[in-house]
Amino acid sequence: MKKYDAIIIGFGKGGKTLAADLGSRVWTVAVVERSKEMYGGTCINIGCIPTKTLVHLSKVAQYSHFTTFEQYADAFHKAIEEKRKITAALRQKNFENLDSKETVTVYTGVASFLSPTEVEVKTDRETIVLQ
């Protein structure tokens, strides 16, 4: 069993902000996120940022006055790749911001409450109990 001052489930805006703040106060903090693809939360990965990126790039394509389907298809593929690059970079930066803090540990796995003070985390490699 690993003991922490705080266990935060979810690596979204609230979780990462709280973890960084508590970590800077020298609290030992565990952050649990179900998937590496969701570090940073919904906004960064599947919400605000990717949506705004695709909307912007669709407007760029619209004003490019393409004349063939192939030109639009190429713009679409480039937009999807640009969205992927942006979300990957933001996800990595969010992970590094927490992982670089000595008192914060990030777990990638599924969290379940065992009791009011214990959380079980099932990762790809092991099952850990946090308290």
For the regions a language model picked out, list residue spans one by one.
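N-terminal Rossmann-like FAD-binding beta1-loop-alpha1 element of flavoenzymes
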Residues: 4-31
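Glycine-rich flavin
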Residues: 2-4, 25-27, 33-131
